Amino acid sequence: MASQPPPPPKPWETRRIPGAGPGPGPGPTFQSADLGPTLLTRPGQPTLTRVPPPILPRPSQQTGGNNVNTFRPAYSSFSSGYGAYGNAFYGSYSPYSYGYNGLGFNRLRVDDLPPSRFVQQAEESSRGAFQSIESIVHAFASVSMMMDATFSAVYNSFRAVLDVANHFSRLKIHFTKVFSAFALVRTIRYLYRRLQWMMGLRRGSENEDLWAESEGTVACLGAEDQANNSAKSWPIFLFFAVILGGPYLIWKLLSTHSDEVTDSTNWANGEDDHVVARAEYDFAAVSDEEISFRAGDMLNLALKEQQPKVRGWLLASLDGQTTGLIPANYVKILGKRRGRKTVESSTMPKQQQSFTNPTSVKGVTTTNSLEEQEAAFESVFVETNKVAGTPDSTGKNGDKQDL
């Protein structure tokens, strides 16, 4: 039997020589002509750039927004303001749906033929005019809805006044019934006294009783008049109290508010306790509520009690004066730092003790100050959540410390 020829070599079994031409022999037959020798022989590893994480919805987006129509920006609010008065006429009436489709007049196409160029130009040229007319009609419709809502409010107010008057009339009837009961008691009392006088059990006449009752009534009225005359001076004191005390109270309130604002922003410049963070990525602010920073910058963060209720954003300061929001996933929390006020208050007793021996202080002033600075710097970072075997400020699951 004749021996079979050996199989042809595989492409990966042949030795390729750089620069060799195409053919069955060795050579880069699979290489594209667009790839030059510099691309294959370029030394070094490819550089990998750090991609910043996605930014969570901004505060303005989290509060929600309204999708307003392009041609109806000023009149969409009337539907929510006067919807409580529910009018069936405005609910079923749509003056902009008379067979029009996007101001294209809902053409009936014959055999699906495209419209002519003249029709397209006419529609495009008249589109702005019809949009203006639509805006005017919307304005009149909004005014009519406002007048209808005003009429409903006035009518409801009038009905409320009538209901109050009706309740007062009913109250008058009830009072009349009560007073009639009092009159019945007086009549029974009069008959009882008259019976006692006729039987001789009561001495004195009815006239004397009436005079005595009248005298007591006059005495009570005189005492009330004297009390009213003596109490007429209180409006004057009240007037002067309002004139003098009003501005004073306003000034006190404003001064208290300014002090609170100043105290609430002392964390930005390091006077009060704050949290230190390092920027991991660059961030560019897009609104006045945010602040920009670059990777490696040190930021001061407000404490948890002063942080706004915005998910994924933190209140921070870069220069110690301007405060703003930053994305939480763009920074790394380092720890809590004590404010300068707290550090100074704690170092005051030590300074007083050192001043008791002035001769020994002169030689070690610089050394003590440097040691105090280093101690204060190291005591700055306080771990809030200690995890065994994790030197970083992140936990086992990679979550940052809670502010």
UniProtKB/Swiss-Prot annotation:
CC annotations in GO = peroxisomal importomer complex; peroxisomal membrane; peroxisome
Instruction: Tell me the GO BP annotations in alphabetical order.
Output: cellular response to reactive oxygen species; cerebral cortex cell migration; fatty acid alpha-oxidation; locomotory behavior; microtubule-based peroxisome localization; neuron migration; protein import into peroxisome matrix, docking; protein import into peroxisome matrix, translocation
Q: How does it sit in the membrane?
A: Multi-pass membrane protein
Annotated S-S bridges: none
Which PROSITE patterns does the UniProt record give?
Answer: SH3
Ranges for the SH3 domain?
Answer: 272-336
Q: Where is this region: Targeting to peroxisomes?
A: 145-233
Q: Subcellular localization, per the record?
A: Peroxisome membrane
Region annotation (Interaction with PEX19) maps to 175-196
Q: Pro residues bias located where?
A: 1-11
Region Disordered: list its residue ranges. Answer: 1-69, 341-364, 381-403
Residue spans crossing the bilayer: 135-155, 175-192, 234-254
Polar residues biased stretches:
59-69, 344-364
Q: Which residues lie on this side of the membrane: Peroxisomal matrix?
A: 1-134, 193-233
Q: Which is one GO molecular function term here?
A: protein transmembrane transporter activity
* Keywords from the UniProt entry: Membrane, Peroxisome, Phosphoprotein, Protein transport, SH3 domain, Translocation, Transmembrane, Transmembrane helix, Transport
Q: Which Pfam families match?
A: Peroxin-13_N, SH3_9
Provide Cytoplasmic-side residue ranges: 156-174, 255-403
Instruction: Report the function annotation for this chain.
Output: Component of the PEX13-PEX14 docking complex, a translocon channel that specifically mediates the import of peroxisomal cargo proteins bound to PEX5 receptor. The PEX13-PEX14 docking complex forms a large import pore which can be opened to a diameter of about 9 nm. Mechanistically, PEX5 receptor along with cargo proteins associates with the PEX14 subunit of the PEX13-PEX14 docking complex in the cytosol, leading to the insertion of the receptor into the organelle membrane with the concomitant translocation of the cargo into the peroxisome matrix.
The entry sums up its family as follows:
Belongs to the peroxin-13 family.
- Protein's recorded name: Peroxisomal membrane protein PEX13
Kindly list the organism's lineage: Eukaryota, Metazoa, Chordata, Craniata, Vertebrata
The gene that this protein is the product of is Pex13
